[in-house]
Amino acid sequence: MDKPASRHFSVLIIDDEPQVTSELRELLENSGYRCVTSTHRESAIASFQADPNIGLVICDLYLGQDNGIRLIESLKEVAGNGRFFESIILTGHDGRQEVIEAMRVGAADYYQKPVAPQELLHGLERLESRLHERVRSQLSLSHVNQRLEYLAESLNSIYRDIHKIKYEVHGNSQPSALRSEDSQPSAPPAPVAESQVSPSNPLFGKLSPRQQAVARLVSKGLTNYQIAYELGITENTVKLYVSQVLRLMHMHNRTQLALALSPAAMQQGSGAVVH
């Protein structure tokens, strides 16, 4: 009879009895599995790290001084979140507590020695199907995440374009700092440097950097649309900042804020200190 086609995942067989690993290896290789064997913890972990195709692990519960359940936990730590594998625990003892502990750490199945060959093969096939499904789900999730990232970037680009159009419509298509006084006859006087604004009102220094930035732009006569464009935030966020600034500076409207941060107010504040 022809040997079955090779499987996608390799099997790591761990048992401190070489005869057991040899018999299991022969059984599984005759069923199309590629096998890696180990008789102790250190070599098992090294083999698992060296071969990313290992997706199925058969491990004896007692490995001399080592414990198969603890070894499965170590393999999970090595695998991390980016690698999947399914594990089977073998034991020559009938212990309910060991079964519970094995299931708790993530072992998928539990067999008593001597294991019926066909029962073990059927169990491996079930786990192999489950592993394929987990990998497919992970790939599908990764693809969805990539599409969401692309969609988010596209939406951000559209949002920036809309903001730019709004700014050009409401702001006469020129940055606020470049508008001439002739084109804006009702605009307040030319803005003062940021370092000059702060001393004019002691409450100004208590604002956060973002609140100060919004306050300065309000004092220059910019609309919420224009401030949003300047700072790269939404208009609703601008409204929230303006409300916070007015409350923290004990003012009732934007006009009071603009007057408080005007060059004249700054000069008065300086004159109060220097005589």
From Swiss-Prot:
Gene3D superfamilies: 3.40.50.2300, Winged helix-like DNA-binding domain superfamily/Winged helix DNA-binding domain (1.10.10.10). Residues 224-243 bind DNA. Changing residue 60 to A: No change in transcriptional regulatory activity. The modification 4-aspartylphosphate is found at residue 60. GO terms for molecular function: DNA binding; phosphorelay response regulator activity. Induction: By carbon starvation. This increased expression is controlled by RpoS. The keyword Transcription applies. Disruption phenotype: Expression of flp in response to carbon starvation stress is completely eliminated in the deletion mutant. Residues 10-128 form the Response regulatory domain. Phosphorylated by PprA. Residues 173-205 are annotated as: Disordered. Keywords: DNA-binding, Phosphoprotein, Transcription, Transcription regulation, Two-component regulatory system. Residues 200-265 form the HTH luxR-type domain. Member of the two-component regulatory system PprA/PprB involved in biofilm formation by controlling the expression of many related genes including type IVb pili major subunit flp pilin, adhesin bapA or cupE fimbriae. Functions as a transcription regulator by direct binding to promoter regions. Negatively regulates its own transcription. This is Two-component response regulator PprB. It comes from Pseudomonas aeruginosa (strain ATCC 15692 / DSM 22644 / CIP 104116 / JCM 14847 / LMG 12228 / 1C / PRS 101 / PAO1).
